[in-house]
């Protein structure tokens, strides 16, 4: 590969200080320290199932709650993806995945369209997974979508265990990302759009 598809983004606000480094042609290596253990567990799923190297450090106002940290990690990760992918020449653009975990099944479909949009349909069976507020799952993905400039549909098709529901969503997200950002050797470096740009 002639150019490295990597990026490092730093985001500093009064609420959070975040650094994200990614290699989207990686092997799934990860170094995660967000201060939110369940978020680290979910980010690990993205790295492993997307074969994306992730190095994420975050310090946030966790004395209030995890909202700003989770949302801002999503924002910064989205910015890093946008930078690493660049002009999108040669990528497959679309990705999708179904992932089961015992009784739970989730589907994620993504389009690196340049137009942000999120359809999020996850009927969590409880409001908390340990100390993690399940509402923050949507906040993470909304932040990612808005800053990676992607259209994404996330559906939990069935599930009784909220941890399983959330984990299948993140695993499917990782696998859908992997498909969408993969370089297609047959496209000869063209942009996958009739408009000529994304």
From Swiss-Prot:
GO aspect biological process, one term: L-histidine biosynthetic process
This protein's UniProt keywords: Amino-acid biosynthesis, Cytoplasm, Histidine biosynthesis, Lyase
EC number from the UniProt entry: 4.2.1.19
CDD domains: IGPD
MF term (GO), any: imidazoleglycerol-phosphate dehydratase activity
Pathway participation: Amino-acid biosynthesis; L-histidine biosynthesis; L-histidine from 5-phospho-alpha-D-ribose 1-diphosphate: step 6/9
Protein's name in the database: Imidazoleglycerol-phosphate dehydratase
Organism: Herminiimonas arsenicoxydans
